[in-house]
């Protein structure tokens, strides 16, 4: 009886470990998930749903300023 109980415990542990391992793996939607957002930004599509026209303009201007700062911060004139 002890051997049978030990065998069942080992099988249960193996089953739990394989199920945990299988459920932890996620299928990636894309290798580069930010790729779509970069394309939208390059095309000038900034989503401003529920925001006024002035606020949308401010968001775009801030985005351009941050991008300009990122790409020019290491340049020495």
Swiss-Prot record:
Recorded GO molecular functions are: growth factor activity
Look up the signal peptide feature and give its range.
1-24
Location of Sulfotyrosine modifications: 69, 71
- Asked whether the keyword Secreted is assigned, the reply is yes
Q: Which UniProt keywords apply?
A: Developmental protein, Differentiation, Growth factor, Secreted, Signal, Sulfation
Residue stretch(es) of the prosequence: 25-68, 74-77
Which terms under GO biological process does the entry name? cell differentiation; cell population proliferation
Described purpose of this protein according to its UniProt entry: Promotes plant cell differentiation, organogenesis and somatic embryogenesis as well as cell proliferation. May be involved in the low quiescent center cell proliferation.
One cellular component (GO) term of this entry: extracellular region
Protein name (record): Phytosulfokines 5
Name the family. Belongs to the phytosulfokine family.
**Source organism, top-level taxon:** Eukaryota
The species is Arabidopsis thaliana
PTM comment: the record says: Sulfation is important for activity and for the binding to a putative membrane receptor.
Entry-linked InterPro entries:
Phytosulfokine
UniProt tissue specificity: Expressed in stems, roots, mature leaves and flowers. Most abundant in vascular bundles.
> Where in the cell does this protein reside?
Secreted
Query: What induces its synthesis?
Result: Up-regulated by ERF115, by brassinosteroid treatment, wounding and fungal infection.
Tell me, in one coarse class, where this protein mainly resides. secreted
């Amino acid at each position: 009886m002890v051997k049978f109980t030990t065998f069942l415990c080992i099988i249960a542990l193996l089953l739990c470990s394989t199920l945990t391992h299988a459920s932890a793996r996620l299928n990636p939607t894309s290798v580069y998930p930010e790729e779509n957002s970069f394309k939208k930004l390059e095309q000038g599509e900034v989503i401003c749903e529920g925001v006024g026209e002035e606020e949308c303009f401010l968001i775009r201007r801030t985005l351009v300023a941050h991008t300009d700062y990122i790409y020019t911060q290491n340049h020495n004139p």
